[in-house]
């Protein structure tokens, strides 16, 4: 497995690198990366229902769409992003969660994973993930919050008037879990 420790903090660059490595690469890859403040939404999400655009514009925080599913996430230099890309006949995304939990446990962090592939410390969600498959290649990527600006995270991912939009766009809204 090839290890890539990306020194680029542009979320758009790192997301494009993931997509290239998945679709054009042949090697199995483990990539670590961080992003300057940014919001990343899933492939099937609507910006209007996931991101407080006014807050993003006021803080000059770009919004990117990734090519995998999953919910909206906030990135800054206080979180680490992990990407696993492998050639496989059968993608078992739980395996990547297990690897991440084992790594954190070995580092002395008491964590637990759940059936939705989230990771928790003391009952608080510190990691969410998204997955996708392209031909015979699978990708699992996740965030790991450790010193993230949670005030900004919660303001950016809190959309006013969402209740009215839920009835119209229910299929495009993710199941949110508060990050404390």
State what each model feature region is:
Residues 113-131:
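Beta-rich nucleic-acid/ligand-interaction surfaces
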Residues 45-65:
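Short, His- and charge-rich active-site/binding loops that engage polyanionic ligands
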Residues 135-137, 142-172:
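Phosphate/diphosphate-binding glycine-rich loops and adjacent basic-rich segments that engage nucleotide
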Residues 90-106:
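Long, well-ordered alpha-helical scaffolding segments within enzyme catalytic domains
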Residues 59-80:
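A glycine-rich, hydrophobic loop/mini-helix early in the fold
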Residues 171-180:
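Residue-level detector of conserved catalytic or cofactor/ligand-binding positions
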Residues 74-86, 137-138:
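DPxDG-like acidic metal-binding loop motif
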Residues 1-48, 131, 156-158, 176:
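Active-site loop/lid in soluble adenylation, ligation, and acyl-transfer enzymes
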């Amino acid at each position: 497995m090839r290890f890539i420790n990306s020194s680029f903090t542009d979320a758009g660059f790192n997301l494009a690198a993931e997509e290239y490595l998945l679709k054009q690469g042949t090697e199995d890859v483990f990539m670590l990366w961080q992003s300057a403040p940014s919001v990343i939404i899933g492939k099937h999400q609507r910006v209007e229902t996931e991101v407080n655009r006014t807050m993003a514009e006021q803080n000059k925080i770009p919004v990117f769409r990734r090519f995998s599913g999953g919910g909206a996430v906030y990135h800054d230099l206080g979180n680490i992003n992990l990407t696993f890309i492998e050639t496989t006949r059968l993608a078992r995304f739980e395996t990547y969660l297990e690897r991440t939990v084992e790594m954190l446990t070995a580092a002395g962090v008491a964590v637990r994973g759940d059936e939705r592939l989230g990771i928790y410390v003391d009952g608080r969600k510190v990691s969410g993930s998204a997955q996708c498959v392209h031909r015979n290649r699978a990708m699992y990527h996740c965030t790991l919050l450790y010193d993230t600006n949670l005030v900004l995270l919660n303001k950016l991912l809190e959309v006013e008037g969402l209740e009215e939009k839920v009835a119209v766009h229910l299929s495009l809204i993710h199941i949110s879990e508060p990050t404390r």
